[in-house]
């Protein structure tokens, strides 16, 4: 079994925010892979299904970003999951827009959702870091992630969500490098990444 956690803030006012791309990814996975309807539990919303023969539960914490770890801990305890079975999808300002990286453990780069999860369950869970770009100045970061994607950004966002969903079987199958490369190839094919970017770190 795998627990896929998408990070974001609940409520309509945050729905289109860059900080909510984790929620967006899970919504697309649930829709395209025929998951059960969303229901409230574990201080969040969950949907159940399978991808590539693997049982998967999707979790969107409704605790607000800074307390995401409480929901993740509740779900992990209930399903008796180890950290390698937990995959967190989140926005990453340290990556340019339309780039994606998968890693296990490591630093949290100031991301309060990751900070909360690490405090509750430990650090060695898998992260899908979805680049949303950096505003260039530290003081502008808060506003950047809590603003909606600009109209000009929406095509790459849609392409990213589609590529993540198309290749979700690789992600839940622990084939992280293949997943990362397939997503990058899809974004390259649509012109959102330079051909020289092979998805390597």
UniProtKB/Swiss-Prot annotation:
- Gene Ontology molecular function, alphabetical: peptidyl-tRNA hydrolase activity; tRNA binding
Q: What is its EC number?
A: 3.1.1.29
Name of a matching Pfam family: Pept_tRNA_hydro
Active-site residues, record numbering mapped to chain: 19
Q: Where in the cell is it found?
A: Cytoplasm
Residues holding tRNA: 14, 64, 66, 112
Q: Does the keyword tRNA-binding belong to this entry?
A: yes
Q: Name one GO biological process term.
A: rescue of stalled ribosome
Assembly mode: Monomer.
Instruction: Name the residues annotated as site: Discriminates between blocked and unblocked aminoacyl-tRNA.
Output: 9
Instruction: Give, as one word, the top-level EC class.
Output: hydrolase
The protein's UniProt keywords, in alphabetical order, are:
Cytoplasm, Hydrolase, RNA-binding, tRNA-binding
Q: Which GO terms of the cellular component aspect does the record hold?
A: cytoplasm
InterPro entries hit by this protein: Pept_tRNA_hydro, Pept_tRNA_hydro_CS, Pept_tRNA_hydro_sf
- The superkingdom of the source organism is Bacteria
- The feature of type site (Stabilizes the basic form of H active site to accept a proton) is located at 91
- Protein name as catalogued: Peptidyl-tRNA hydrolase
Q: Which family does it belong to?
A: Belongs to the PTH family.
Predominant place of localization: cytoplasm
From which source organism is this entry? Answer: Rhodopseudomonas palustris (strain BisA53)
Q: Which SUPFAM superfamilies match?
A: Peptidyl-tRNA hydrolase-like (SSF53178)
What does the record give as the function of this protein?
Hydrolyzes ribosome-free peptidyl-tRNAs (with 1 or more amino acids incorporated), which drop off the ribosome during protein synthesis, or as a result of ribosome stalling.
Name the reaction it catalyses. an N-acyl-L-alpha-aminoacyl-tRNA + H2O = an N-acyl-L-amino acid + a tRNA + H(+)
């Amino acid at each position: 079994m795998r627990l896929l956690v998408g990070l974001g803030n609940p409520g309509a006012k945050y729905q289109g925010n860059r900080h909510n791309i984790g929620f967006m990814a899970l919504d697309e996975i649930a829709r395209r892979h025929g998951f059960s309807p969303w229901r409230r539990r574990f201080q969040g919303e969950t949907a159940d299904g399978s991808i590539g023969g693997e049982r998967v539960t999707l979790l969107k914490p409704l605790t607000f970003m800074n307390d995401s770890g409480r929901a993740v801990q509740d779900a992990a305890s209930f399903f008796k999951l180890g950290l390698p079975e937990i995959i967190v999808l989140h926005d990453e300002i340290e990556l340019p827009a339309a780039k994606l990286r998968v890693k296990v453990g490591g630093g949290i780069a100031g991301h309060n959702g990751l900070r909360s999860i690490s405090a509750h369950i430990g650090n060695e869970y898998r992260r899908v870091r979805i680049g949303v770009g950096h505003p260039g100045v530290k003081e502008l970061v808060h506003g950047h992630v809590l603003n909606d994607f600009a109209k000009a950004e929406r095509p790459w966002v849609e392409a990213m969500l589609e590529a993540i969903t198309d290749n979700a079987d690789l992600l839940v199958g622990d084939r992280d490098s293949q997943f990362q490369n397939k997503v990058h190839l899809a974004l390259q094919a649509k012109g959102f990444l330079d051909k020289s970017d092979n998805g390597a770190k």
